[in-house]
Structure formats: C-alpha cells, structure tokens
Amino acid sequence: MNHLFVLFVNYHGFVGDNDSIVLNLMAARYFDSREEAEEHRIELYGNERYEFQNRISILEWL
C-alpha cells in the first residue's frame, strides 16, 4: 500500500515594531515516505532568514 505525505508550512512573523503579519502560505509538497518528509521539515524549521516562525506539520494519507 502506498502512502502519501504532504508537508504544509505556515509562516507567522512581524513587520516593524507594531505591525504583525500572518502569511498563510500553504506550501504543499509530496513525499514518498515519512522519513523524507521529516528530513525536509527539520531543514525548513531551521530557516529563519525572514524572521518568521515556521509552523510545519505533516499530514498523512493512507
């Protein structure tokens, strides 16, 4: 049985001192295995170049 893993990324950050912005950018990507998705999740979670907090979840379909 094949499994489908999708990685969704939510960005939440701040612009300026008083302005906040929530970008619900659902960047979906498909992976063949949970391990591959987890490796990419860890890779994305460490990326802070835009000073956004990365909220990442993996959804699994059987």
Q: Whereabouts are the PLM-identified features?
A:
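Short, mixed-charge low-complexity intrinsically disordered segments
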Residues: 25-30, 38-62
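Short aromatic-glycine-(Arg/Gly/Cys) micro-motifs in beta-strand/loop hairpins
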Residues: 1-26, 53-56
